């Protein structure tokens, strides 16, 4: 680093911090990718080097598990804050246990106590109050006055601006799960920057950006950007003060592995202290951390046991992140997820694999401390990854059902080799981009609107008539559905849905920027940021199968007293998505492409790039409860299949045929992600550990080599699920983790309704 670029003349500190590191470009500008590419060490070996948990890890994890049991006994929340608004510096230091604090190698809690939920009213005071009251806590009444009379919240602003049509669409769940009652999340700060450069350098870089912003010309875009940069600088200064509370000075760069992990974690802690976004991803940190660990190992200042302890303790902190949520949120996103998504592996653009020993160490946390939903461990997969790593990851999947896989070979050409997963399955260039999260549009209900002329079957007006939510097009009145007529009307109704959906999201994102801006996260992202506009699809497989039924069989309409199509009788057989049958799978591809094209016709906020996803989280239950019967045979008000997963029971040709169908969906039309969740009986993979992990590797290689995007892998039988549902008190189920649509969850933390939904899903007994 040149002397003039060094803040406060601290060249010696940077020299010490960067000793032995290679490369030049990253030393004069913020460029973490360049640093990684010049300094990481590939690892081709197996897991034999890994260390068992230390005594400190066992004691801390044991205490944390006791707290988690207390939390479960109290209905899912151990304690809620009622007197302090969460901020970077609103609390003194907090530890897992005051008597054990000397054992914590990585420190920092969201509040002053472990698992205590912060009070975060900026997204909506009513939501913050309701979240506390749900668990028996009462927020100090002064805050209601402050955040209704003196400080407007995001939620109030959105509902002030909603049109009656938007409110009706939201009420009837044709668009649903919207981030208007919770933080939008999905913004990943490049937390590595805190460790590599220190806060002072980052502040100086942001000050340069502020000086260059606008050149004296003041108009809306420039004014807003100047204000946002100023907020980012303020947030960076706040991070320094937050770290001081724990006795650390993060003004300069980290000088060893322990500091690098601690500095990085402070950056993430700043995010979760100030935002309660639906997804608060950690990002792609493993390779970065490995560089520091390797240097310390080579210098003899760190042992493998100590290195694993640092990773275990950091992971323990990610497992502790909690937010106070309202009941309607928990119905959408069940099981208390945070989406602290953390990626391992992948390939570089130069063809080198990026597997390091620390990738193994992060996966090993699931052995040292048992299965856990958080962090949301994600393997960036390619068949070209080292065989030893693929087999170890497969072993962890078979043993824990806690990790997911995403296809690095389809993401890398678009996002480069330094992207993070910003929620469940969505990629974003680390430190270069941010995403406007937009939940999902209910394309299954949209199909019913096309048949019923825009009226909603479950939702009635005050006089008992079906609500007119969509355009008042002529309904289909024939006894049997005609494929061409249905497709024409469905095309028109999707036009309307795409338009209102995008406009609702434009409004929400505008208000979130205005009233609940993510300054701490955006401070760790380039000022000249690229923005994506993430839409989503719910009910995907049911629409595909319904259109297939109309095209290839005969579908008779059963109408109620209002003339609404309330159920359907299908005569004859039809191809179903999930069986590697192009007749159905081609409809799936058409549906995805068509919806994205319609979304892209509309203006998106801040000139963001529109994308879409096929992803539902556990909200497939909520969406299904709001949607009537469909021509594919799905009964009214029952759960949808999640994400891009084929409908329950539709897969009749085994696991591989199901995977082949999903693999046909083109990722370039769903850059926000295509989520596929499969459950495999252990015996279907083999009769020994070696057979199972080797066969799973073959499945993953074949699936992803076809261009598929994502796979959740569960390896267990239905009997285990049923027993866990009936006997959640059994010790073996305390940390029983399963993969659902895009994330993992402790099975016993799901509602019974959602547990039954998981049990109803296809469990493949054969390949």
Model-derived segments and their meaning:
Residues 2-767:
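Conserved catalytic cores of very large enzyme subunits
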């Amino acid at each position: 680093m040149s002397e003039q670029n060094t803040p406060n003349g601290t060249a010696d500190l940077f020299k010490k911090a960067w000793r032995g590191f290679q490369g030049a470009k990253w030393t004069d500008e913020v460029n973490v990718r360049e640093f990684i590419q010049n300094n990481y060490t590939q690892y081709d070996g197996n897991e034999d080097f890994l260390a068992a948990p230390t005594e400190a890890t066992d004691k801390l994890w044991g205490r944390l598990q006791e707290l988690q049991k207390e939390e479960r006994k109290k209905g899912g929340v151990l304690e809620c804050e009622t007197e302090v608004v969460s901020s970077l510096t609103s609390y003194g230091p907090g530890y897992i246990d005051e008597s054990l604090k000397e054992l914590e190698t990585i420190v920092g809690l969201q509040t002053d106590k472990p698992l205590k939920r912060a009070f975060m009213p900026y997204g909506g005071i009513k939501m913050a109050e309701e979240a506390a009251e749900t668990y028996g806590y009462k927020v100090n009444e002064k805050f209601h006055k402050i955040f209704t009379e003196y400080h407007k919240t995001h939620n109030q602003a959105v509902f002030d601006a909603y049109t009656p049509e938007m409110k009706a669409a939201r009420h009837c769940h044709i668009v649903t799960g919207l981030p208007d009652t919770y933080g939008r999340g999905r913004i990943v700060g490049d937390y590595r920057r805190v460790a590599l450069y220190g806060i002072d350098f980052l502040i100086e870089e942001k000050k340069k950006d502020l000086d260059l912003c606008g050149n004296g010309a003041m108009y809306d875009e420039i004014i807003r950007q100047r204000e946002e940069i100023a907020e980012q600088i303020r947030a960076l200064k706040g991070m320094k003060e937050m770290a001081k509370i724990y006795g650390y000075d993060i003004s300069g760069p980290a000088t060893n592995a322990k500091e690098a992990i601690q500095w990085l974690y402070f950056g993430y802690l700043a995010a979760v202290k100030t935002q309660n976004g639906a997804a608060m991803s950690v990002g792609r940190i493993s390779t970065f951390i490995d560089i520091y660990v390797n240097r310390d190992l080579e210098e003899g200042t760190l042992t493998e046991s100590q290195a694993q302890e640092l990773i275990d303790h950091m992971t323990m902190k990610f497992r502790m992140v909690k937010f106070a949520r309202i009941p309607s949120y928990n119905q959408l996103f069940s099981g208390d997820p945070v989406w602290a998504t953390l990626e391992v592996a992948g390939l570089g653009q130069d063809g080198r694999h990026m597997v390091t020993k620390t990738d193994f160490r992060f996966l090993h946390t699931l052995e040292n401390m048992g299965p856990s939903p958080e962090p949301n461990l994600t393997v960036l997969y390619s068949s070209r990854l080292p065989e030893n790593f693929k087999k170890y990851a497969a072993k962890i999947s078979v043993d824990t059902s806690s990790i997911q896989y995403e296809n690095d070979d389809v993401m890398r050409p678009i996002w480069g080799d330094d992207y993070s997963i910003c929620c469940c399955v969505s990629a974003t260039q680390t430190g270069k981009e941010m995403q406007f999260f937009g939940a999902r549009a209910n394309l299954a209900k949209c199909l019913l609107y096309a048949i019923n002329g825009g009226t909603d079957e479950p939702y009635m007006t005050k006089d008992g008539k079906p609500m007119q939510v969509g355009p008042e097009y002529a309904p289909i009145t024939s006894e049997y559905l005609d494929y061409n007529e249905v497709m024409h009307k469905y095309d028109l109704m999707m036009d309307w849905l795409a338009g209102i959906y995008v406009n609702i999201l434009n409004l929400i994102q505008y208000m979130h920027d205005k009233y609940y801006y993510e300054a701490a996260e955006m401070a760790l992202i380039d000022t000249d940021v690229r923005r994506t506009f993430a839409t989503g699809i719910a009910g995907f497989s049911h629409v595909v199968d319904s259109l297939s039924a109309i095209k290839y069989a005969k579908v008779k309409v059963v109408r109620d007293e209002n003339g609404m199509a309330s159920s359907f009788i299908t005569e004859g057989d039809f191809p179903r998505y999930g069986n590697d049958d192009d007749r159905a799978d081609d409809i799936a591809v058409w549906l995805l492409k068509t919806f994205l094209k319609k979304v892209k016709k509309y203006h998106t906020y801040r000139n963001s790039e529109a994308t879409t996803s096929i992803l539902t989280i556990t909200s497939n239950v909520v969406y299904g409860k709001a949607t009537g019967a469909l021509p594919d045979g799905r009964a009214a008000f029952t759960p949808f299949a999640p994400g891009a997963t084929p409908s329950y029971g539709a897969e009749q040709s085994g696991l591989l045929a199901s995977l082949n169908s999903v693999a046909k969906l083109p990722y370039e039309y769903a850059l926000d992600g295509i989520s596929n969740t499969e459950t495999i009986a252990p015996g279907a993979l083999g009769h020994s550990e070696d057979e199972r992990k080797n066969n799973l590797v073959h499945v993953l290689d074949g699936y992803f080599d076809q261009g598929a995007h994502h796979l959740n892998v569960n390896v267990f039988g239905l009997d285990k699920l049923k027993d866990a549902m009936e006997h959640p008190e059994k010790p073996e189920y305390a940390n029983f983790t399963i993969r659902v649509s895009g994330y993992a969850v402790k099975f016993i933390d799901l509602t019974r309704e959602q547990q039954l939904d998981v049990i109803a899903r296809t469990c493949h007994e054969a390949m």
